[in-house]
Amino acid sequence: MTEKKILVAVDGSEHSYKVIETAIKYARLLSAEVVLVHCHKKFPTILGEPLRNEAIVTTLRKAETLIAPFTKRLREAEINVEERLMEEPAGAVIPDIAKIEKCELIVVGSRGLTNLEGIFLGSVTNRVLHTTPCSVLVVK
């Protein structure tokens, strides 16, 4: 029997904790493991060595620190979890990971961009809703 998977996206905000608690409920209900995703900013491309390498290490450390409490909470709840720290924009990469991992469900927060940029680009949640191959649960 294939293991069921739920993709859970976190951005490190306080709202991410609500997303995790909701994901725990659904993971238990579906007997599913969690693919925990955090998308960090792109690595700088204009810096030369060794500054670029230092920037990459700093970015990855911040991402690992950000995702750690969410991974810990899932493990405390006895949910199997796999971490994915991704460079690409969240709205593009979340549906791709869900497809590759054959996820049953994506759990995301309702928070989106609220500035002028958000009007033109749309929110991460909106993009995920319209491009994902599976069901999406939006946590308010």
What feature does the model see in each segment?
Residues 35, 82, 137:
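Conserved beta-strand positions in the Rossmann-like core of class I SAM-dependent methyltransferases
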Residues 2-50, 73, 77:
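Small/aliphatic-rich secondary-structure junction motif
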Residues 53-65:
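A short acidic, glycine-rich active-site loop
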Residues 25, 96-140:
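Gly/Ser-rich helix-loop-strand patches that form or flank binding pockets
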Residues 44, 91-93, 115:
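Generic structural signal for helix capping and beta-alpha/helix-loop junctions
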Residues 1, 72-106:
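Structural beta-alpha unit
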Residues 31-33, 79, 103, 134:
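Short glycine/serine/threonine/alanine-rich loop segments
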